[in-house]
From Swiss-Prot:
Any further remark recorded for this protein: When the channel is activated, one or more imidazole moieties of His-37 probably become bi-protonated.
UniProt activity-regulation remark: The M2 protein from most influenza A strains is inhibited by amantadine and rimantadine, resulting in viral uncoating incapacity. Emergence of amantadine-resistant variants is usually rapid.
Protein name: Matrix protein 2
Gene Ontology CC annotations of this record: host cell plasma membrane; membrane; virion membrane
Family membership noted in the UniProt record: Belongs to the influenza viruses matrix protein M2 family.
Gene3D superfamilies per UniProt: 6.10.250.1640
Length: 97
């Protein structure tokens, strides 16, 4: 039941809900949309890094090289490899005695 369709009224036996007809198509549609929204919010919080990384970079691992001459492709690969090699130099080996 949606909170927007419920009304609590005091009766002799205590509190009871007088809800609108739950077979109303609008209530059913709103309930389904609410449940789907809740599921998507939970999945978004659990997997936001994976989801947004996929959206940002797509399924490919790097920029497209379609239409680029082979010499430029090789130059790009060398630049990428040298950048990785430079990053490897930041690690420090610590020996415990």
């Amino acid at each position: 039941m949606s909170l927007l369709t419920e009304v609590e009224t005091p009766t002799r036996n205590g509190w009871e809900c007088k809800c609108s007809d739950s077979s109303d198509p609008l209530v059913i549609a709103a309930s389904i949309i609410g449940i789907l929204h809740l599921i998507l919010c939970i999945l978004d919080r659990l997997f936001f890094k994976c989801i947004y990384r996929r959206l940002k970079y797509g399924l490919k691992r790097g920029p497209s090289t379609e239409g680029v001459p082979e010499s430029m492709r090789e130059e790009y690969r060398q630049e990428q490899q040298s950048a990785v090699d430079v990053d490897d130099g930041h690690f420090v080996n610590i020996e415990l005695e």
